């Protein structure tokens, strides 16, 4: 890195980091054949923490700070810093991917990258959610009655046969802070504001509020539930080009 001072008022530093961590601790979920199971009252998927994998973290760090005002009684200092971070999984045991909830550890991808079901939209003829079909699960989808073909393209109404895709990373493109320190004699006032730009998050609270559950259960719901499908729109047919509403609510 490089650091310095200009005009006895402005301080700056620029740095680059590239850190590789080995034998990281990951939670590995065992398959059903190893005794893993699901209980509605308590999720008892058999897992084990293992020292596996190599991860790279690299990026730039920039820091600026300077005295805007500097006198016997008054001092006003402003500061700014920014950091970029690129995270990548470099090595996994046997090169095998590891699913972890809505994310997946995979060589060449970030450990914070989302790996989710690809939602296509709402079928305006039925009100059901449609997902891109995993070609390997077509027979299973057909047997379960979840296969839907619309204008020559096959979809599924169940995530069990849906195709998962990379959907961006939870890491911001850049993050940092702004700071202000104002001093008058022996009194001082400091303010620190943080920021982050980019990155995707999964709003689990919103997802929960959009789940109506059973009719007998009492729970708080989000007002967007009122936008749910409410019947076949006028003029809609099975072959309408706009049969799938990508912004619809099932």
Regions inferred by a protein language model and the residue ranges of each:
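Outer-membrane beta-barrel transmembrane strands
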Residues: 1-6, 16, 55-57, 168-184, ...
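Extracellular/periplasmic, surface-exposed regions of secreted and cell-surface proteins
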Residues: 1-114
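Transmembrane beta-strands of outer-membrane beta-barrel proteins
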Residues: 10-12, 76-78, 178, 184, ...
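Glycine- and acidic
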Residues: 43-47, 161-164, 173-175, 250
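Short acidic-hydrophobic sequence patches enriched in Asp/Glu that either
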Residues: 44, 56, 197, 213, ...
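Conserved small-residue
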Residues: 50, 67-169, 201, 208-248
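Glycine-rich phosphate/pyrophosphate-binding loops
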Residues: 184-204
């Amino acid at each position: 890195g490089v650091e310095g001072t200009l005009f006895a008022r402005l301080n700056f530093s620029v740095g680059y980091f590239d850190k590789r961590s080995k034998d990281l601790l990951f939670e590995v979920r065992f398959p059903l054949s190893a005794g893993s199971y699901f209980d509605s009252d308590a999720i008892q998927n058999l897992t084990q923490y293992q020292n596996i994998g190599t991860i790279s973290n690299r990026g730039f760090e920039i820091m600026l700070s300077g005295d805007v005002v500097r006198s016997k009684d008054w001092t006003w200092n402003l500061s700014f810093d920014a950091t970029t971070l690129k995270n990548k999984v470099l090595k996994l045991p046997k090169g095998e991917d590891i699913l972890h909830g809505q994310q997946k550890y995979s060589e060449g991808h970030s450990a914070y990258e989302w790996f989710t079901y690809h939602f296509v939209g709402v079928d305006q003829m039925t009100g059901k959610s449609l997902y891109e079909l995993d070609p390997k699960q077509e027979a299973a989808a057909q047997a379960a009655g979840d296969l839907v073909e619309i204008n020559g393209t096959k979809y599924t109404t169940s995530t069990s046969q849906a195709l998962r895709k990379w959907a961006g990373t939870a890491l911001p493109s850049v993050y940092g802070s702004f700071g202000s320190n104002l001093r008058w004699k022996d009194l001082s006032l400091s303010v620190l504001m943080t920021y982050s730009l980019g990155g995707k998050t999964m709003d689990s609270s919103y997802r929960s509020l959009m789940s109506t559950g059973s009719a007998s259960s009492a729970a708080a719901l989000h007002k967007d539930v009122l936008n749910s499908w409410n019947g076949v729109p006028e003029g809609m047919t099975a072959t309408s080009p706009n049969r799938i509403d990508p912004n619809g609510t099932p």
